[in-house]
Structure formats: C-alpha cells, structure tokens
Amino acid sequence: MCEENENKDSEYIETTPVENGYNSERFKHLWFLCENCETLIYKKSLLEQKGVCAECGATLQMTSSERIELLIDNGTWRSINTKLSSIDVLEKKHTTFDIKMVRKVSILLYKVISGKYFYKEFFKNKYYNKALRILVAYNNTLVNILKVALGSKFIKYLNLDSKETIKILQDIIDTGLKTAQFALFEIRKKIKNEFYRFALLNKAFENKQISSLLAQNLEDRRDDESEIISIEFDRMAFRVQTFLILESLLKLNTQLADVKEQLLSQDKFLKAVATSLVKKELYFPEDKRKTRKIKKIFPFYPGTDPETDYFLWLRTHMAISLMERYLVLKEFKYWFRNRYCGLLEEEFPRFGSDILIEYVKKQDRYESYNMIDHIMQDDLHTSTNSVELFQQINLLFHHKNNEKDCDNNFLSYTENTKGIYFCLLEIMKQFSTLTLDSKDKFPKKKGRDTKDTEDIEDIDEEDIEEEYPLTYDSLTKEEKEYVDANIELIKSTFNLGKEEFIETEEQSYQDYNTSYQKETGLPDAIQTGVGEINGISVALGVMDFQFMGGSMGSVVGEKITRLIQFATENFLPLILVCASGGARMQEGSFSLMQMNKIAAMLHTYQKEKNLLYISVLTSPTTGGVTASFGMLANVTIVEPNAYIAFAGKRVIEQTLNQIVDDEDQISDSLFDFGMFDSMVPRALLKNVLSETIEIYMYGD
C-alpha cells in the first residue's frame, strides 16, 4: 500500500507542472480570431498578410501601431503630442464645505484686516494691487461657498436641529461683510488720494512748462524747448500710469461692492430662515416627535437621500405652509404665492432659495455709516494679540500643505513678517480647497438611536392620524401618485423586498480610461506623428478602435488639431486613418466641440494653404467622425467591406420605422453611389497613397 501511495504521489508531482504549464490565457495575446470564418491567425503572420485573413479573405481590424508599421517606411516614424491623455472633464466637483473651517478662516482674515497688521502690504506697498486682487478673489469664493450652503441645503436649514449651522453661517456672513466693507473703505480712500495726487502733479507739470516759456534769452529758450518736450513726455507717462491705477482700483471697487450686495442678500435670507425656525418652535413644539411618527408610517425608506425621500418631501410641504402663514409680512405671502405657483412640489427645494433671495434683494440695504459703526466696535474678533494671530496663520498654512510638524516651523515665521504675509496670501488663494469637507459626501447610514425606537414603539397609528394632518390618506390624487411612484423607485433602486442587497458601483470615467490605457498601452484613441511613405514626408494620424471604440474625445480632437497645425506650418500632406464609433459620450458636449474645431483647422489647411488632405475610412467609421473630418478630405479612400455610417442600423429603424439591410451601410454598396473617391484593398494602400500625393504635388 505504501508503495502504491508513493507511486501515486510521484505521478501527481510529475504531471502537475505539465498541466499547470499549459494555460491558454498565457498565449492569448499572440493570436487573432477571424470573426468571419473563426480561424485563429498568428499575429506576426497577420501583419505579413496585410491584415487580411488567408482563409476567407476578410479584412480584419488592426491596431494603430500595426497600421503605422504597414504604411510608414521603416525608421522614419516620429510621434508627436504623445503625452496628451484624457481627464474626466465632466467630473462633478466636490462642493461639500466644512463651514466651521470657513468661519475660522473668515474670522482670521477679518482680524488681520481690522487690526491693520499688514496694512502696508495691502494698501501702501507698491505691489498692493496684487494683494487687493487676491483679497477680492477670496471674497468672491466666500460668496460662492455661501451659495452652495444656502442653495442646495435650503430645506435642511429649515429643520429644528439646524440652529448651530445657522449661527455658523451668520458668523461667516458677518465677518465677510466687515472685511469687504473695510477693504471698500480703504480702496475708495486710495481712489480719492489718486485723484488728489493727479491734480497736484498735473499742476506742477503745467508750472514747469510756463516757467520754460517765460525764458527771456534765445539760447535759454532753445535749451528749454527740449526740456518742455521732456516735461510733456513725463506728463503723458504720468497720466497713463494714473489712468491704469485708477482703472484697476475702480474695477476692484465694483467687484467688492457686488460681493457686499450678495452678502447682504444672503444675510437677509438667513435671517428669514432663522425667523422660520422660531415660528416653528412656537407653533409646533412637538415637531421632532411628530417626525418620528411619520417615519413609522413609511418604514420602507432605507436612507435619507433627498431626491427620493418622501419624508423630506412632506417636510417641504409643511415648510411651505409655514412660510406662507407665519414667516414675515403679508406682502411677502402674496408675492411668494405668485412666484411659487408655477413650481412642482419636487422642484421647490431647487428653486426655493432663488425665490427668497430674489425677494430679499428688493428690501432696503444696510446704510454704509451703520456698517462702519458696527465695524469699529470692539468685539471678540479683534481681541487676539499679534503672536496668537500669526500662530493661527502658520497653523492654517501648514494644514493646507498637510504638514504635521507645524509647531517646529512656527519660530521661523513669527520673526519674519514677510513670511507670515506670504502664508496669508497662500491661504486666501487656496481658500476653497482649504475649506473642502474631508468627510465622505454620502456617509453610510447611521444606526438608529435607541431613544427614537422606544418613542416610536409607544405610538399608535390612530393617534398619528389624529395629531398629524399630512398623512397619506389626506393627500390629493396627484400627490398619492407621486408618492407611489417614488416608493416603486426606491424599491427598485435599493433592491428592497429581495433576499439580499446587491451593491452596484458604476466605474468612473477616469478609471474606465485608465483601464484602456493599461490594456492598449496608448494614452488615447489616436496616434499622431510624421513619417515617410515611399520616401514622401507626410503627417499621419491613425485612430485605434481597440481604445474605447476609437471614440473622439477632447484629447483625440486636440491631437488631430495640433497635427493639422503642424502640417500647415511645414506644408506637409495630411493623412487621417479613421476607425471610430463617433463622439465620446462620457465627455458630453466637449467631444462634440471637437468636430467644429477640427473642421475649422481643415478649412485653413485646405482652402487657404491649398494643401492635400487624404482620409482613409476603415471599419467601423461612424457618428461624429463621419460627420466631420472623415468626409472633408480632398481624396476619400475606403477599405473593402468596411462599415461606414452616421447612425447605426438600430437607431435608423427605430426612428424611421424602416428596415435597413446590412449591405446598405457597407462600403462596397456605398461606393456604387459615389460616396467615396476610391476603394482600395489594404495590400495596395501604401502605393496608392504615395502615387496620389505625387500626382497632387507634381501633376502640373
């Protein structure tokens, strides 16, 4: 028995390496499958056969590198613009801000401005204009952050648990207004001083000219004539300089005044929201308890997504009623009803803040002298000494740079005021990045509080219907249809009612693009460069269908545009080999823009410079490529049995309700209708291209 076991073990040891050694995946990249006759073709021999199947004669797809090797003379190819690669141009920006950090930075900057720690650098230094521009840009960023907070989070701030958030936002607006007003005061004072300086110096120039003209001796007059010319030149230079300074200051003044107006509107809007909270507390003291009752009625909802949360829709309904009944003036109620009547219930969270802001803009503004008096009051914001203030600037600067050992770096900055000033400017420049919320935008669902569950268990459904008026039964027919549709949407979206929860995560465009880069070894769906075809220099662009279907995105369009520009400057013939599914839908309108851009460059190349452009259409060439540069060539060449179309067969049949034959979009059929200038087999393509170029260049 022992001998038999040993023999089995030895057989297993001997056979295992052989079985593991043969793995078809290891050799897959060396072979190509002909889809027409299902014959495996060795890739090295495929290139020797010019990409044509030896068994059935079908024209097979080739990569861009293989086509370049097929068309260009050995050793003459030189790639250009190889480092261009796609980015996610439609990526949604992270717009969740840490408002506590925003408040911290805004208070810090107000301390600096009001304390006049860097007054010389901001308002007296010869480079003050740069500092003021950064200050104005900071205020614009602050307003935009508040727009995000008071726009997309409008309904959230109407909840009873938003008091702290509203207080933080009020602090931000308050310090922002004070900073803007202080800067406006200094800018306007500087404008006044510039006008005064201009009047004095202009008078001085005039006095110099008069004294020169009053010279009695002829020789003195001749000497003074050159002096007069010099004075006039200096006077003109001074006027130009003053004009540029005033133009810059007036522009900054206008921008800051606009920022101040927006901050005032946001301040009044926030006060309206705070008033709403007070009214809700007075008229609905048990609001929190009632919301738990509503959650018991609708247990089907898994999270708090505002797009599909019926509870939020219900609260919106209630908030609108509250604002109409209790918020502020009768004029506001009448105005609000007229503005709101055209909106659907689900659209109000999107447009509600715009309506309110439009309303408060019509109200009286703060008077400037009241604002200045308010600024001059000594408050908590101005009570920090310079050492503590500089330390806060240093900490924020190193927080921006993700540096942990900022305490060690503090000493070098406290002794150098210029260093602290530099840190402050960097903080203002990177304000939006510094205040981004580092938390996940959509955090995982938190566990329910035990207190909430205890309260809910003690509630009777009959009591709910009696106490809370907005139940399902009290809704109108249209509202019930809306709720039912949302319930089905929620169940289908979150796979509710099924045994297991299936998580589906969509791959981002950036990851999708990176996967193709790793698979093909190309930065994007085209290779461009310069080479020789039978000794003739040409500019060549070859699209690669293996990379995301050869789709035309921003990078493909840019590389083709730069290739055309290069060919125009160097008077080279241009050849574009097309193999594309059309515009890249992941980039939206950015991909469609490439069609116009390329067509405009081709117009200059062909019409103004009278140069030769040849397009070679291979299978498949569809969509935006067919509609743009694919059909704009002086000579259009197509390969046999190639699929050439604008819209696909299925799209045409669904749109026109007509049956489309498979042959109707094949190059052999289209060539009979004169759609192309020539149909050339791949084996003859190189010679045909060189002969066409020779005829065009030396035909006369």
Curated annotation (Swiss-Prot):
Principal location listed in the UniProt entry: plastid
EC number annotated for this UniProt entry: 2.1.3.15
InterPro entries linked to this entry: AcCoA_carboxyl_beta (IPR034733), Acetyl_CoA_COase_Trfase_b_su (IPR000438), ClpP/crotonase-like_dom_sf (IPR029045), COA_CT_N (IPR011762)
Cofactors required: Zn(2+)
GO biological process: fatty acid biosynthetic process; malonyl-CoA biosynthetic process
UniProt keywords, alphabetically: ATP-binding, Chloroplast, Fatty acid biosynthesis, Fatty acid metabolism, Lipid biosynthesis, Lipid metabolism, Metal-binding, Nucleotide-binding, Plastid, Transferase, Zinc, Zinc-finger
Zn finger residue spans: C4-type: 34-56
Cofactor binding comment, as recorded: Binds 1 zinc ion per subunit.
Molecular functions per Gene Ontology: acetyl-CoA carboxylase activity; ATP binding; carboxyl- or carbamoyltransferase activity; zinc ion binding
Domain called CoA carboxyltransferase N-terminal: residue spans: 445-700
GO terms for cellular component: acetyl-CoA carboxylase complex; chloroplast stroma
Residues engaged in binding Zn(2+): C34, C37, C53, C56
Annotated Pfam families: Carboxyl_trans
Superkingdom field: Eukaryota
Pathway: Lipid metabolism; malonyl-CoA biosynthesis; malonyl-CoA from acetyl-CoA: step 1/1
Family, per entry: Belongs to the AccD/PCCB family.
Function: Component of the acetyl coenzyme A carboxylase (ACC) complex. Biotin carboxylase (BC) catalyzes the carboxylation of biotin on its carrier protein (BCCP) and then the CO(2) group is transferred by the transcarboxylase to acetyl-CoA to form malonyl-CoA.
Subunit details: Acetyl-CoA carboxylase is a heterohexamer composed of biotin carboxyl carrier protein, biotin carboxylase and 2 subunits each of ACCase subunit alpha and ACCase plastid-coded subunit beta (accD).
Protein name per UniProt: Acetyl-coenzyme A carboxylase carboxyl transferase subunit beta, chloroplastic
Organism the protein comes from: Cryptomeria japonica
